[in-house]
């Protein structure tokens, strides 16, 4: 029974994690948005392969790698039943199916497309061996029509170099070629597909009103409201609402960091993290605050900074309802309620609630004092100690007794004094 459950959890297809655009939607995206889309889709492909899943459609991966236009590839049915009308695979150049798509290439963070040594130009034998899906080389012209007749359950392949020999009818290859990756027209409901082709979102969420162009997207979205998490990690039991999130989570257990920076050699678990890291070397800071003109390398940092101006605190503690502007601060705060101290000092065994406290404590053992007074040169291992010390030079006495008005340089001195009145 457990084996059946595990098997069901591993049934992740590219359809589950693909995000698609119509031609009109694609044209509305700017260069940065298109690049981000390609990076995320390629990362998803790589993670699926690294977990032993079948390689997604080769023509899509080829387009992603070579930066060609990526609007929806629709498969029509007939002139009478579908507004899509036998839509074709749009490319500017003839698309070459990559014959060998290796798992190792994905894990390096880039795809290596190796040419087949076979002289046979048809798309032929398919075999899944040692994690590699090996395909013979085949070409499709821009006018090639991959027309799937869903109501008959038949695949019709037309175009240069595509034969119908028995090698083409391997079950694995048929499933691979005919996978419902982007959109499949329904002969029984042509009106529904006409809406999808028109760029409308007929499937509405009753909870929040958000619209989707496919029922499956609506079903997946509804898990946000229901809290349903059908994808469970076999290693730790943690559950997720989407298969793509489970795949990314799995790298935590493997410890794998397949995306390496060519500049400094630093490795990352996700391609998106590598892309965020890259501006450190270029010095680029594209995100500028309109309030104070401060610029940021990453969008996430810019969003966090912007909350200092708006006062927004979207992260609320469920225990005491205290709100925070930063998710990390909420996580640190939550430990107050649990009493957990997960950060242990290797030198003395003392435990701390957050990593910053551990770092400060470790300076006692190392003798490091990074905070130096510009007036006298005295150094401290905590910034708060430097702030307290600087009052000596300024003569400031910010801590005043409410009872008698006497002022003190330090808060601790004020607390000692207040005992006189009690």
Curated annotation (Swiss-Prot):
Residues 122-152 have a biased composition (Basic and acidic residues). The keyword Transcription applies. One of its GO terms (biological process) is regulation of transcription by RNA polymerase II. Pfam families: KRAB (PF01352), zf-C2H2 (PF00096). Residues 12-83 form the KRAB domain. PROSITE patterns: KRAB, ZINC_FINGER_C2H2_1, ZINC_FINGER_C2H2_2. May be involved in transcriptional regulation. The keyword Heme does not apply. GO terms for molecular function: DNA-binding transcription factor activity, RNA polymerase II-specific; RNA polymerase II transcription regulatory region sequence-specific DNA binding; zinc ion binding. A zinc finger (C2H2-type) spans 203-225, 231-253, 259-281, 287-309, 315-337, 343-365, 371-393, 399-421. GO terms for cellular component: nucleus. Keywords: DNA-binding, Metal-binding, Nucleus, Repeat, Transcription, Transcription regulation, Zinc, Zinc-finger. Belongs to the krueppel C2H2-type zinc-finger protein family. Transmembrane segments: none annotated. InterPro entries: GLI_C2H2-zinc-finger, KRAB, KRAB_dom_sf, Znf_C2H2_sf, Znf_C2H2_type. Residues 113-158 are annotated as: Disordered. It comes from the Eukaryota. It is found in: Nucleus. This is Zinc finger protein 550.
């Amino acid at each position: 029974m457990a084996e059946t459950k595990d098997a069901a959890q591993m049934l992740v297809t590219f359809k589950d994690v693909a995000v698609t655009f119509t031609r009109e939607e694609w044209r509305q995206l700017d260069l940065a948005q298109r690049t981000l889309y390609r990076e995320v889709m390629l990362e998803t492909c790589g993670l699926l392969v690294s977990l032993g899943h079948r390689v997604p459609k080769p023509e899509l991966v080829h387009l992603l790698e070579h930066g060609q236009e990526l609007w929806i590839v629709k498969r029509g049915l007939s002139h009478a039943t579908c507004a899509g009308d036998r839509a074709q695979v749009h490319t500017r150049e003839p698309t070459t199916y990559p014959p060998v798509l290796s798992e190792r290439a994905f894990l390096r963070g880039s795809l290596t497309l190796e040419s087949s040594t076979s002289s046979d130009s048809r798309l032929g034998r398919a075999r899944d061996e040692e994690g590699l899906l090996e395909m013979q080389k085949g070409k499709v012209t821009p006018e090639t029509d991959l027309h799937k007749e869903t109501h008959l359950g038949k695949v019709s392949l037309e175009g240069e170099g595509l034969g119908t020999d028995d090698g083409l009818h391997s079950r694995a290859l048929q499933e691979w070629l005919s996978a419902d990756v982007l959109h499949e027209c329904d002969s029984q409901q042509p009106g529904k597909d006409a809406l999808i082709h028109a760029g409308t979102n007929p499937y509405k969420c009753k909870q929040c009103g958000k619209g989707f162009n496919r029922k499956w997207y609506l079903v997946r979205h509804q898990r946000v409201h229901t809290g349903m998490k059908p994808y469970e990690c076999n290693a730790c039991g943690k559950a997720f609402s989407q298969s793509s999130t489970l795949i990314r989570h799995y790298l935590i257990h493997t410890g794998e960091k397949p995306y390496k920076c060519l500049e400094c050699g630093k490795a990352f678990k996700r391609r998106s993290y590598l892309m965020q890291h890259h501006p450190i070397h270029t010095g680029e800071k594209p995100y500028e605050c309109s309030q104070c003109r401060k610029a940021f390398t990453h969008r996430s940092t810019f969003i966090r900074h912007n909350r200092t101006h708006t006062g927004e605190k979207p992260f609320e503690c469920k225990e005491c309802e205290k709100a925070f502007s930063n998710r990390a601060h909420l996580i640190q705060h939550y430990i107050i309620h649990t009493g957990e101290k997960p950060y242990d000092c290797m030198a003395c065994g003392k435990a701390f609630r957050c990593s910053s406290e551990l770092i400060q404590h470790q300076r006692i053992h190392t003798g490091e004092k990074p905070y130096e007074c510009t007036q006298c040169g005295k150094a401290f291992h905590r910034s708060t100690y430097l702030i307290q010390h600087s009052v000596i030079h300024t003569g400031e006495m910010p801590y005043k007794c409410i009872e008698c008005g006497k002022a003190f340089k330090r808060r601790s001195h004020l607390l000692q004094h207040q005992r006189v009145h009690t």
